[in-house]
C-alpha cells in the first residue's frame, strides 16, 4: 500500500513539487522510478512498509537513522490515499497511531482517505475478521484525527469513501 503507480506523485511533480513516494511493492516503485527518470521529475520513489519501517542501521545503530527519524517534520504535505484501511485491516494499526505518525512527518497538510469497513475492498482485506473493526466509523476516524489535525474540508468520493484535507495542529511535538 502506498503511492502505487504514482498517479498523484507524478501530478504533483509536474507542478514543480518535490515528492517522496513510498510503497511496499518494489515493482510499482521501480516503474515509478523509471517514469520519473525519463521525464526528469523530482520524485524519490522508495520501497517502505509504514507498518514496519526501516530501522536505524550501522555501527551501534547510529550510522543511518531510521526511516521515520529521517521523515520527522520533513514534509509540507502528506497524502494517505487508499492506505488507512490497509494499515488497519492488514497490519492492525489503530487509527490514533496512524494520525500520530502523519502528524510527526508533516509540517502542515494531510490529505487522507477514509474507507468505511462496509467497503468491498476493506471487507476483502478483513477476510472475516469484521469483529475487529466494529468500532471503526467516520466519527471514530474524525475523533482520532482531531487529536493532531483540524479538519479543513472533506469530500465524499464514493458510497463508502471520503477524502479529507486536514491542517496539522501547532506545537503537538
Language-model segments: which ranges?
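Short alpha-helix
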Residues: 132-149
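S-adenosyl-L-methionine
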Residues: 33-69
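A conserved beta-strand element that flanks and buttresses the S-adenosyl-L-methionine
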Residues: 79
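Conserved SAM-binding motif I beta-strand of class I
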Residues: 18-23
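Conserved SAM-binding loop of SAM-dependent methyltransferases across substrates and taxa
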Residues: 5-17
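Conserved S-adenosyl-L-methionine
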Residues: 2
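Conserved beta-strand signature within the Rossmann-like core of class I S-adenosyl-L-methionine
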Residues: 104-116
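A short, conserved alpha-helix within the catalytic core of class I
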Residues: 87-101
